[in-house]
Structure formats: structure tokens, C-alpha cells
Amino acid sequence: NEVLFYFTEDEYKVAAEDTRERLVFLRACDMNAVKRIDQIYLGNGASNDFFYTRTRKKTKFVVVGCTKTFRNCFCVSMGTNKADNYDAAMNIRENEIQLEIRNEDLNVFSGKEIDFDIDYVSKNEFEVDLPEKVDFMYMQNHKMWDEYDTRCIGCGRCNYSCPTCTCFSMQDIHYKENKNMGERRRVWASCQVDGYTNIAGGHSFRVKHGQRMRFKTLHKIHDYKKRFGENMCVGCGRCDDMCPQYISISEAYEKVARAMREKDNEELISEVYEKVVKAMKEKREE
């Protein structure tokens, strides 16, 4: 969480900026996730998020090459096994480290110059069948979500391990010494836990776990894509690793894909049936 500003009875003060620079080492899928987060905080609305912007400007990223896939990764299916929006890249060998420096601020190393291509995986242990398009109204009350009512326990571990989850809530903390003074915090939140969609009057938009799973799943492969042109999920597989109930987001994507194919088949059968009935009717009238 982060403090946004402090307030008194008649004024507020923006929290002091942390001036330290940050160097983040991450994988290609995570670098693609940073791009998604940038879209949310910097390309989503009339203005950039002030607090995210000032932190982002002081952060540099080093992509670590992947020589092999991890068990639950499906980055190849999501098209995120490669990245090019980094400040530096690194390949780790047995007795050496190979570097590519793109940001001159990081050009503090010496060594032999070589041709550099970052390591990346070209095949995961499994492929994910993604839907080409999603009919939200059709999927909204689809029976596939019912199983998650009992399977999901709403712990939120999938969200907290996800590099593209950006939801947050606001908390006003009032000081004991003076109830009219305090601070406003932005706190990372989970759309899967109880209370996230609570509103005044004791109501909640998504009470059942299946409804929350639907929201998360479709946000990753439909809502975000509709706005920004690419899937939000980067296929890192961490949510599958973290889930105590062994719920797989990749399996949820495939269920959506199957449901959409079933819908298309039903529409095709209905269309053919209507044409046959119409042709038979016209023939009788002759």
C-alpha cells in the first residue's frame, strides 16, 4: 500500500516522494505485464495517475532470459514469451553473465563485446486454447461458473500473485490524537475476497465465488482486450501455482473457448434449420 496524502481539518498535503531509484529483475512475461500496468495507470482516462507516474519514472527493468519453461507457464500461448521494452537484458550461463544494455544509465560494466540474443522459451509444457472472441452476455450466466461457487474459497492468492492485477481500494486512516486528521492510503485489493464489491445499504455486486471468477477471467481475456487490443493475462502461471484449491486460470480460458464454440454451433444449426423450414414452406406453396 502507499500513502497518497495527509489531511487536517482544512488542508491536505501530498505524501513526500521516495526519491530512491529502483532496479527490477524480471522475466519476459513480467515485462509484458508492466506494459499492461502502464496502460491501466498511464493510458486509461483523461490523465496519468500521478503517484504511479512518479514511481515509474525512477524504475528500470532488467529482463532475465528463460532457458526453460516452468510447470504452469503458458506465455507462448499468450504471446508474452518475448519482450523488448526493457532497459537491460541478462542471460545467465554457468560461469558468466551476458548483458545487453539499452539504457545508458546502466552502462557501468566492462567486458568482451559479443552478439546478444536474449534467451526465451518457444514452447511450454502445454498450450492454451484461447477464445477468438467472447460474447459477454452469453457468458455472463453460463453454467461453467457454478463449479467455482464451491471450489473457490475467496482467499485472493491468485490476485496477489498476479503481475497484471491492478485493483485497489482507498482507506482513510484517522489519527487517535485528532479524529479530524489522518492519511489516505491506496491499498492493493482482490476482486475474489469478501467485501470487495460491497456498497452502501449492505449490497454487493458479486456475492458468489463463481461470479467473481467470471469477472476475473473475462477481464483477463475480454474486457482489457476490448479496450487495449491484447489480452491482459501474460501466462506466467503464478495463480495456478498459488491456488490452494488447484483452480487453473488456463483451464477457465479453455472452458470459455469451448462455450463460445458451442454457441457458434448452436447458431449455425439454428440458421440451417430456419433455411430448411423456409425452403420446405416455399416448396409446398408452389
Feature-to-residue mapping (PLM):
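A generic "binding-loop/recognition-motif" signal
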Residues: 30, 158, 239
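Iron-sulfur-associated redox domains of electron-transfer enzymes in respiratory
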Residues: 1-137, 145, 269, 274-275
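Oxyanion-binding "anion nests"
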Residues: 152-163
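Hydrophobic positions within alpha-helical membrane elements
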Residues: 32-33, 161, 242
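Hydrophobic/aromatic-rich, well-ordered segments within soluble, folded domains that form packed cores
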Residues: 26, 31, 164-170
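Ferredoxin-type iron-sulfur electron-transfer modules in oxidoreductases and energy-metabolism complexes
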Residues: 130-150, 168-286
